[in-house]
A protein has these predicted regions:
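ATP-binding N-terminal substructure of ATP-dependent carboxylate-amine bond-forming enzymes
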Residues: 1-109
């Protein structure tokens, strides 16, 4: 059996549609067949900082008090790399890159 395709779900960003992108990411995550695909969630804060988010954090994004959700400012930034076989994403902690994962497809609602 071959490895599952890894999808990077990228959402948020420096846009007036930030909250809508977050809500759309929740819907997309719910629709992805997790038996066939692995998902890496990457949120972009309103200030433009990229971060890895757990799938549980994404699933919990909701409208609250009439306000759309926001990607929080990250403690550690996510970075994109060109890997041996294509794209990779990693988390930068100080001067080190940790949790490096290959990515096959990027989906940005």
């Amino acid at each position: 059996m071959s490895e599952r395709t890894k999808i990077a779900l990228v959402f948020g960003g420096r846009s007036s549609e930030h909250g809508i992108s977050c809500l759309t990411a929740v819907s997309v995550l719910g629709a992805i067949d997790r038996e066939r695909f692995d998902v890496v969630a990457v949120g972009i804060s309103k200030s433009g900082r990229w971060s890895r988010m757990s799938l549980e954090e994404v699933a919990d994004l909701r409208i609250s008090g009439g306000a759309t959700p926001e990607v929080p400012e990250p403690e550690h930034d996510a970075v994109w790399l060109v890997g041996e076989h294509g794209g990779e994403i990693a988390t930068r902690v100080g001067d080190q890159l940790v949790d490096v994962q290959e990515v096959d497809v990027v989906f940005a609602p």
